[in-house]
Amino acid sequence: MKIVILASGTGTLLQSVIDNVDTTKIDILAVGSDRQCEALDRAERAGIPTFRVDYIPRATDRDQWNRDLADALAGYAPDLVVSAGFMRIIGAHVVERFAGKIINTHPALLPAFPGAHAVADAMAYGVRVTGTTVHIVDSGVDTGPILDQRPVTVRSDDTVETLHERIKETERALLVDVLHRIAELGISIEGRKARIGSHD
């Protein structure tokens, strides 16, 4: 399975994929970002090609940015696009060109606590259990069909930072596991239900 990974930050999730995927089954074609970041440095150190489509903050140009991102991804012809700490909303041009072929990780048990502040929102709500989700990317924000989830218990002495770090540890293991299963079994999607393989 050929994949392209999108990342925006320090790249710890990306590094977990680089370090742990079976390269005989999963080929990381490239790592892309919307900015210069440590994630790109990690990819370059691993000998993985990188590309940038710098984000355009003006609302009038976001449509063009999404077109440019879609074109950049299409140049690699990936079987799967993996959003791993990519801090931009993936727009319609990308979603339509890679329908059902983009996955994202999220630090909560969706559909609870979507958006950029999921960990803080979960703590503020007082939940006892949160977790991490891998889902198909659709045109909404963290609304796509769910592929897999893993729980993380909220401790009484947790801060947002300590909870987020434990979620990240779980997220790294989950993403690597999901990628291996997709490489072996593929993805099937029927409406809101996404499955790895024909049965899950």
Regions found by a protein language model. Give the residues of each.
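Hydrophobic beta-strand scaffold residues
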Residues: 28, 49-51, 80, 102, ...
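Membrane-interface segments of envelope glycosyltransferases acting on lipid-linked substrates or membrane lipids
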Residues: 1-4, 15, 57, 120-121, ...
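N-terminal Rossmann-like dinucleotide-binding module
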Residues: 1-38
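Short, surface-exposed acidic-centric catalytic microdomains
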Residues: 24-67
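Donor/substrate-binding cores of folate-linked one-carbon enzymes
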Residues: 20, 84-197
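N-terminal glycine-rich "phosphate-gripper" loop used for MgATP/nucleotide binding
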Residues: 33-34, 62, 76-92
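Short, well-structured alpha-helical segments in soluble
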Residues: 67-76
